[in-house]
Amino acid sequence: MKYILVTGGVISGIGKGIIASSVGTILKSCGLHVTSIKIDPYINIDAGTFSPYEHGEVFVLDDGGEVDLDLGNYERFLDIRLTKDNNLTTGKIYQYVINKERKGDYLGKTVQVVPHITDAIQEWVMRQALIPVDEDGLEPQVCVIELGGTVGDIESMPFIEAFRQFQFKVKRENFCNIHVSLVPQPSSTGEQKTKPTQNSVRELRGLGLSPDLVVCRCSNPLDTSVKEKISMFCHVEPEQVICVHDVSSIYRVPLLLEEQGVVDYFLRRLDLPIERQPRKMLMKWKEMADRYDRLLETCSIALVGKYTKFSDSYASVIKALEHSALAINHKLEIKYIDSADLEPITSQEEPVRYHEAWQKLCSAHGVLVPGGFGVRGTEGKIQAIAWARNQKKPFLGVCLGMQLAVVEFSRNVLGWQDANSTEFDPTTSHPVVVDMPEHNPGQMGGTMRLGKRRTLFQTKNSVMRKLYGDADYLEERHRHRFEVNPVWKKCLEEQGLKFVGQDVEGERMEIVELEDHPFFVGVQYHPEFLSRPIKPSPPYFGLLLASVGRLSHYLQKGCRLSPRDTYSDRSGSSSPDSEITELKFPSINHD
């Protein structure tokens, strides 16, 4: 097993996750099996109770693990399925060690950070690195480990110390360290500054880790003189200084690393059993990157949510939209709308914001209402859903978005003016959305319906069923405490709101579609978590197709895109492969 540790310096949020994912991608394209671990030095057990403003979105895994959004990057880049133990937090490690101490496993010893916490970290990494993450079930050969935060943070000290010991335990030829640092370029001088990187590497060396590659994040490509200066002061060869400047899309990052000889370096440094030249997989990335840069037509989607000031709050949603837009050869324009701005009360308090929000909504090609929690802004979302339904605008509601679509329909079509979710109005006489039996009101963490669940289609006459390849069922990831009340199902269906997908027991409403509408769909699950660059998520793909007016044509053709719309578009591509790469959708395994 080979281990690659990715650390960061100067500032957090520098792009360690994308660098780690890209390193994994180029190694996977060389034929290796790659897994990844994300270490978060916070004391929370998991990311489940975070505010989206605090740490971005909460990413959900197959096993129900609520984890850091970087694990979403790993899954999308490497097309793998991770588990909750691939996200290691200080809280998890301390809980693990304290539980062992309570059981008497330390035989009366004084339990300390060194060696007990550091040993537990090393054991966890070595154990988790061997868990298969690919569909073929083979054991990984390389484990990419991203250490969150920046070098020097007091929280990450036990982890740095653990890896200082770890490099000797697994031997030098099996461990290497990539250090990601910032090279700022102040606008006043226009000169690229190396001092932050020098200080960051010096601090890392002082803690006992020596970087093998120094990856410099910068706005423009590094000058040769700057590279040589970093090489001299950071005690690495010039070819070990890698420049990752700002690029048009993240699909370019693996290509950027490969062009600078990263594969050759790993080949020598880690003695990897691979060919020098990454093959077919990187050609797909090159095609995607080239294709992304050539897009001319634009499709605009109004994203009506609560956390729109911070795009990381909807990271997977945005990626799912991008994957689908790329698949139909369109540039994506997301119009972020704070749902509270659409509410009538805003028209009195801040009329300009109110009119700007409605202007954005009315000018969009499609409307998306993603998941969320809490009552703030829900009336604005209901207004947006009503507008999309009445104006025949393509609409997708995810999780809370689906629940509010049912609330809106109940109020405006069935005439139940007080219809609501018991989350927002516990005393309503028409509780069309109710909390689930699993929900434990006394505790917040881990009390939701989480992870991959099966949904069965109830009818053959369904747009969503066709988008999923006419399958009998689908398996997607969930994260919710509330659900549509099955008591009102008959009343809603009689008026045209059809529940075309339900859970295996037939008790939970999973997919809703409106008759006589171009595309009005709600899903209780979160399809964005399984979207991949080459395998877009069907609900998002349907929304994008409907938004550009191509959905009915696509369904008539048996759910096949025209050649100009698939990844077989090879204009300007020098790929040696002759086969056509069809667009794929999440695999449905029939038992």
UniProtKB/Swiss-Prot annotation:
Pfam families: CTP_synth_N, GATase. Residues 300-554 form the Glutamine amidotransferase type-1 domain. The active site is at C399, H526, E528. The keyword Zinc does not apply. Changing E161K: Localizes to cystolic filament structures. GO terms for molecular function: ATP binding; CTP synthase activity; identical protein binding. Coiled coil: none annotated. Induction: Up-regulated in T-cells and B-cells activated through the TCR and the BCR respectively (at protein level). It is found in: Cytoplasm, Cytosol. Keywords: Acetylation, ATP-binding, Cytoplasm, Glutamine amidotransferase, Immunity, Ligase, Nucleotide-binding, Phosphoprotein, Pyrimidine biosynthesis. Its EC number is 6.3.4.2. One of its GO terms (biological process) is pyrimidine nucleobase biosynthetic process. One of its GO terms (cellular component) is cytosol. Residues 562-591 are annotated as: Disordered. It comes from the Eukaryota. This enzyme is involved in the de novo synthesis of CTP, a precursor of DNA, RNA and phospholipids. Catalyzes the ATP-dependent amination of UTP to CTP with either L-glutamine or ammonia as a source of nitrogen. This enzyme and its product, CTP, play a crucial role in the proliferation of activated lymphocytes and therefore in immunity. Belongs to the CTP synthase family. This is CTP synthase 1. The gene is CTPS1.
